[in-house]
Amino acid sequence: MKFKEELVKELIANSNREMAIPMENYMKNNFSFLGIKTVQRRTIFKSVYEKHKSEIKSNYRTITWELFQEKEREFHQCAIDLIQKEIKKKFILEDIKLIEKLIITNSWWDTVDFI
């Protein structure tokens, strides 16, 4: 999937280990971070999203799950941004299973509160 590949590439290219350390500490070292602040992460996400809309529209559930399985928290946050953007328009009953998986995978207040 080109969207996920490009998003991963862009986020890693913009990682900042100095910023990651306090982020990890804030989350009690439960997750690794790339060190990308929210505004920058959302800018990167939006840029990559715009290039791959057609792929995303038909595969957003799979992409969301794949991003949520990545190690760094920024990927989980992008997964939340993606599902928030898409699920409102196309919610089906089976999405509850995906939402349940997201709640129990890498769960912590920052993602569970949204879900």
Regions found by a protein language model. Give the residues of each.
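Alpha-helical scaffold domains
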Residues: 1-115
